[in-house]
Amino acid sequence: MPETEDPATGLFIKYLSNNRIFRDREVLRHSYRPQILPHRQPQIDTIASILAPSLRNETPSNILIYGKTGTGKTASVRYVGSELEKASSTMGTTCRIVHLNCEVIDTQYRVLAQIAKCIDDVDEASSDKAKIHIPMTGWPTDQVYSELKNQLDTGGGVLVIVLDEIDKLVKKSGDDTLYNLTRINSDLKNSKVSIIGISNDLSFKDFLDPRVLSSLSEEEIVFPPYNAPQLVDILTQRAAGAFLDGAIADGVIPLCSALAAQEHGDARRALDLLRISGELADRDESKQVTDVHVKQAQAKIETDSMIECIATLPTQSKLILFSMLTLEQLGQNIFTSGEVSRVYQDIAPEIQLDILTHRRITDLISELNMLGVINTRVVSRGRYGRTKEMWFDANTGKIREVVLKDPRLNGLKDLDINQMETKWLKTWFR
């Protein structure tokens, strides 16, 4: 450690003492809940009007909410839910909200158990004797369902169950959970249940029994994508709390908004762009966030998204990518599907991987192009016909690093490229 460095703060002191950009960067996080949601008042009013009967101890209609990622669905539902609980407390009624993320809680057992747990957490009226503690595994599902009904009737009032990313639950576990929840009111004596399903995938309805769909979609609300001017309003509101005065150049918010509007009006993307732009400016010790930082942030987000996409690819697709990386390592920036196929066929036996047909390899190359991992074009070679050429635009070092993290491909780190090149030169490599 340098002699001048304060041991209490260490190497972080210079990063903490030179803040010229942020007032509170948490305001730009997805988890931040603003008091006002610009351009979502019509949807908020509709949700509130549907849930209002719960304040009279009446059963609200079930709601299905649709919209692409970053269109304010979850934030609007959370806002209305918070206001409903405040109104309930003021009026002396019992209205409770349980919010479940079905990407994590994705089985019938876990959904029922988590609802019971959340009721325990929020229901101060229930006595310790009335409270139940359902384990997250181990009970028969019908016992969990029975205990949940008992707890609901003990607490009374109205419970609104929000199933965020409901499509993930349906696709993994079928519609049994929704079937039971949409019919639970017929088994309750002293309480009532309403369900709000949130999804960015309309196709999940195809997996539902018509009776379940009819009960679940008593009301449907669509959240349209934000346009660029609306995103400007959202970012301007957040920026006031997130950045110090004068820390943002004039063109930054319009540029972030325009870029995010191209990505189907995603407010989350716009917020990420603005936050990362600020972080890059902060690290550079710049006095202002500029358009240059926004463009750097855009490139970083696209790279990070692509790397995450590559990490989830099947092993065969990763090996095809590795074959392209090998060609590039040998000096080729553009390669044909035939060249990639031949390198792949030579490398696959090295790691005891089944060799795919050329047709299947071509299909996987098309998928990689569709995902934005590579670029392709079809070119004519006269009497030799047409062929597909491909190349990388992204940082191939990062792609290689992610590909080789696959346990099946890890051994390729030690592949002797020079030896392989000698073999190819003797056979086909030009």
Swiss-Prot record:
Keywords assigned by UniProt? ATP-binding, DNA replication, Nucleotide-binding
Sorted alphabetically, the Gene Ontology BP terms of this entry are: DNA replication
Spell out the Pfam families in the cross-references.
AAA_16, Cdc6_C, Cdc6_lid
Q: Function, please?
A: Involved in regulation of DNA replication.
NCBIfam families according to UniProt: orc1/cdc6 family replication initiation protein, PRK00411.1-3
Which family is it part of? Belongs to the CDC6/cdc18 family.
Asked whether the UniProt record includes Methyltransferase among its keywords, one would answer no
State the protein's name: ORC1-type DNA replication protein
What are the recorded GO MF terms, alphabetically?
ATP binding; ATP hydrolysis activity
List the InterPro entries hit by this protein, alphabetically. AAA+_ATPase, AAA_16, Cdc6_C, Cdc6_lid, ORC1/CDC6, Orc1/Cdc6_arc, P-loop_NTPase, WH-like_DNA-bd_sf
- CDD domains per the UniProt record, alphabetical: AAA, Cdc6_C
Amino acids binding ATP: 71-75, 226, 238
